[in-house]
């Protein structure tokens, strides 16, 4: 009985450590064995058009900063499409967005349909060849969109993941823990990219060729499905 409990404990420990220790270690071994996956960053082509999409529910505390951020990006790239889906917010999110209605494609849902539904709808509404999906509380760097062009200049690239930087990691232990976890997650994603085996995108910011995207089932996370 003691032996069985010990074996079960070891198995549980291995399962816990696998995502953080053995899985990254296996990726490093694969990378050493066959080298990095081919990554072509061709000369930047500005022929690709870009749309930025995000869903919002009760985001009144950040929505104005988000819009200032995106309109700044449009100032740098005048043809940037901006699409927003409001998922029946019960705060002032929709009211704060309405003044921007003539500058963006805005859909305000009268009922809760969920983020996946909203992202699917915005992807259908978008006209650009590259669609960037992001979150309402994520601010995009001024160079975020221009950095996409060298990757998508390679026709074999269908999706590009963003790099998330926590700006409030010093505010609390929870924020610091989240930032530490995300740094580990990003390290793993880099190893997956190096070995040509990225499992999922980052929901905070990722870009995909619109013609390659397929509707995401309602019960599946969009960044995992992609």
Where are the regions a protein language model picked out?
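Conserved donor NDP-sugar-binding/catalytic core segment of glycosyltransferases
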Residues: 142-176
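Acidic helix N-cap motif at the loop->helix transition within catalytic regions
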Residues: 62-65, 90-99, 143
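A conserved acidic beta->alpha catalytic loop
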Residues: 51, 69, 85-94, 111-113, ...
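Short aromatic/hydrophobic "clamp" motif used to bind/position activated sugar donors
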Residues: 131
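Short, acidic, metal-binding catalytic loop of nucleotide-sugar glycosyltransferases
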Residues: 68-79
């Amino acid at each position: 009985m003691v032996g069985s409990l010990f074996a079960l404990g070891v198995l549980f420990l291995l399962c816990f450590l696998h995502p953080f220790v053995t899985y990254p270690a296996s990726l490093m071994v694969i990378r050493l064995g066959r080298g990095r996956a081919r990554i072509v960053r061709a000369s930047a082509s500005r022929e690709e058009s870009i749309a930025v999409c995000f869903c919002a529910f009760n985001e009144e505390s950040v929505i104005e900063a988000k819009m200032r951020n995106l309109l700044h990006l449009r100032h740098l790239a005048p043809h940037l499409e901006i699409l927003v889906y409001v998922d029946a917010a019960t705060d002032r999110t929709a009211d704060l967005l309405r003044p921007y209605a003539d500058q963006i494609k805005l859909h305000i849902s009268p009922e809760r349909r969920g983020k996946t539904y909203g992202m699917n709808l915005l992807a259908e509404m978008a006209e650009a060849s590259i669609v960037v999906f992001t979150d309402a509380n994520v601010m995009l760097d001024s160079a975020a969109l221009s950095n996409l062009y060298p990757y998508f200049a390679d026709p074999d690239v269908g999706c590009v993941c963003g790099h998330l930087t926590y700006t409030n990691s010093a505010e609390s232990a929870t924020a610091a823990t989240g930032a530490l976890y995300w740094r580990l997650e990003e390290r793993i994603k880099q190893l997956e990219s190096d070995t040509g085996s990225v499992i999922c995108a980052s929901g905070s910011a990722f870009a995909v060729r619109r013609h390659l995207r397929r509707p995401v089932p309602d019960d599946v996370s969009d960044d995992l499905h992609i």
